[in-house]
């Protein structure tokens, strides 16, 4: 925790059903308890406009390129209206999903789509990447069981195991591509508190 200073950008990534949102909230509550200025946000969403875009993105069957551009447009609004101002004011920003989710969920559907996602991001906001990303690594079989046990609220929740395996492989690939930024937390056999304690050790 000694290395954690004001104005840092922390993201959580991984498949659905892995406890990613839980860990985002746990870290947020912990930092608040330490009197560290922090905000918690999410993607797709985080602002009024981006949340409206989220409704279309998660419920409508869009063309692959349309879906990617929708996600990027929502992110641009989120970055400009919320993330960047908070960082400039010295806040730690914790975001439940960010650029790596776009690479895996939208980029995989397009030829050379993963590289396209990072290229678009660099064009829109060249100086903004997370300082640290936590990839919550849970095996696809476990993740889909967790998803199936809850109400399926969007089109991604209704996808099958093959889809989850592709997404999982993508996040693994990104963790190897960006090892300085992405920290992998092996969480398949850990409870939420154990995962949280591992995350704290990286801060």
From Swiss-Prot:
<dbReference type="GO" id="GO:0004798">
    <property type="term" value="F:dTMP kinase activity"/>
</dbReference>
<dbReference type="InterPro" id="IPR039430">
    <property type="entry name" value="Thymidylate_kin-like_dom"/>
</dbReference>
<dbReference type="Pfam" id="PF02223">
    <property type="entry name" value="Thymidylate_kin"/>
</dbReference>
<keyword id="KW-0067">ATP-binding</keyword>
<keyword id="KW-0418">Kinase</keyword>
<dbReference type="GO" id="GO:0006227">
    <property type="term" value="P:dUDP biosynthetic process"/>
</dbReference>
<keyword id="KW-0808">Transferase</keyword>
<dbReference type="GO" id="GO:0006235">
    <property type="term" value="P:dTTP biosynthetic process"/>
</dbReference>
<comment type="function">
    <text>Phosphorylation of dTMP to form dTDP in both de novo and salvage pathways of dTTP synthesis.</text>
</comment>
<dbReference type="InterPro" id="IPR018094">
    <property type="entry name" value="Thymidylate_kinase"/>
</dbReference>
<dbReference type="InterPro" id="IPR027417">
    <property type="entry name" value="P-loop_NTPase"/>
</dbReference>
<keyword id="KW-0547">Nucleotide-binding</keyword>
<dbReference type="GO" id="GO:0005524">
    <property type="term" value="F:ATP binding"/>
</dbReference>
<dbReference type="InterPro" id="IPR018095">
    <property type="entry name" value="Thymidylate_kin_CS"/>
</dbReference>
<feature type="binding site">
    <location>
        <begin position="14"/>
        <end position="21"/>
    </location>
    <ligand>
        <name>ATP</name>
    </ligand>
</feature>
<comment type="similarity">
    <text>Belongs to the thymidylate kinase family.</text>
</comment>
<dbReference type="GO" id="GO:0005829">
    <property type="term" value="C:cytosol"/>
</dbReference>
<dbReference type="GO" id="GO:0006233">
    <property type="term" value="P:dTDP biosynthetic process"/>
</dbReference>
<protein>
    <recommendedName>
        <fullName>Thymidylate kinase</fullName>
        <ecNumber>2.7.4.9</ecNumber>
    </recommendedName>
</protein>
<keyword id="KW-0545">Nucleotide biosynthesis</keyword>
